[in-house]
Amino acid sequence: MKAKNSKKTITDSTVDQDVLTYTVGEDTILDKALIKWDCMGTAAHVTMLSEIKGLKRPIVTKKESALVRKELARVVSLAEKGAFTIREDDQDVHMAVERALTERLGDLGKKIHTGRSRNDQVAVDVRLHIKSEILSLEKELCALSAALCSFGAKAGAVPLVGRTHLQPAMPSTVEMWATGHAEMVLDQLENFEAAYRLADLNPLGSAAGYGVPLPLDRSRTTELLGFSRTIHNCFGASMARGECEASFLSALAQLMCVLSRLAEDMIIFSMPEFAYFRLPREYCTGSSIMPQKYNPDVLELVRGKTAQVVGWQTAALTLLHAMPGGYNRDLQDAKLLYMKGLETVRTTLRILAKLVAGMTVDADACRAAFSPGVFATDVALRKVAAGVPWRDAYHDVRDHLEMLESEDADAAVKAKSHEGTCLGIDLGIYLKRISDATALAEKRLDALEGCCRKLLR
């Protein structure tokens, strides 16, 4: 006898309502981001099934394949309008799409899962989604780096006290500070490229991790979906679930750490005690009690959200660390973790790019911050130029710090012209990296979208 508090799913199993809600989790919401990619994966799979030769009877004919692909294109169109629903009894996007196709195409819709498991289905969906999102994030990352370069170029050689241990150290410039952060942001492309390469592998056809007794052409779906290669071992394809999510989260967490340091510098340098930079008022909030306050809440939240993303990365790694071979339901949560990290990083990059674009420099405040001690190393090096050994020059200055005098900060920074220092910053290097990375991301996105358009027509 069926329990009153139960529901029948598309797989014909009757599940207690509380169990269904607990196991489905947030998938009915999260999987909205995967509808397009699930349809793309299904289109590739059905196309491949229609091309299998040597069977007594085709699993799917070419005509049927075309009908399925047309219906999948309709599902994507509905999803783009917000009109495609993933129900709780669907459990996920895969069963929702199968239900929709079965409702429209009858028995033909029931054929699309042949030779597949939801294990390799979700793995394909997630990898296609991560590939697309990495490329979009790379463009956002480049936009922030460009904003920092523009900010630095406008300030040019405005002197800025360089700091170590947060203490005054040596003469620097605003441009050096800004482009230094721009370079750190750009360097994060390496981490995203590593995550992209890992995601760019096709698990489709591995089914539940052990293959199927059908002559599936896995290389064909790799070609149709635009992956660089197939994950050869079916068990290995199953084991790789969660790995690309964790790798993506690692890149996201590392980037957030870089952005958090940028945010901290901007908080400090915009304090009244420093006042080197002025943050745009629209990015600051007031106080409910102190009328004079303009707080850098946005930048403080960048620091706070960094803790969140690092936490999600740690959660993903912990999820995997003692998991037995083969699929385990724990892996469902890897999707939630990377999607949260993705959205946090995307919004952070966008708001920081706008904030940097609206930030201004107080050149007088920057120059006024130079104390005699900031020039100590320069004084010692002038002694070296006069023939004094470095260590003797160092101790001579160290022993007579009270004799140091203020110097012209502008002249001090102009004395540094070798590669990468105050007057040795080549903006062209950064602009070329930004241009090349943006162009490559757009080219890859166009190729991925091209695969999608070809399959869903």
Annotate the PLM regions.
Residues 2-211, 216-218, 222, 285-286, ...:
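A helix-coil-helix interface module used to build multimeric assemblies
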Residues 2-41, 107-108, 275, 290-457:
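Glycine-rich cofactor/substrate-binding loops
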Residues 45, 49, 71-78, 100, ...:
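Generic, well-ordered alpha-helical scaffold segments in large soluble proteins
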Residues 45-56, 176, 244-254, 379-386:
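Short, well-ordered beta-strand elements within core beta-sheets of diverse protein domains
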Residues 66-70, 235-240, 396-400, 434:
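Short linear loop/turn motifs
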Residues 68-69, 225, 270, 281-283, ...:
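A general structural motif at alpha-helix termini
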Residues 126-133, 138-139, 146, 153, ...:
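Charged, flexible cofactor/metal-binding loops and thiol motifs
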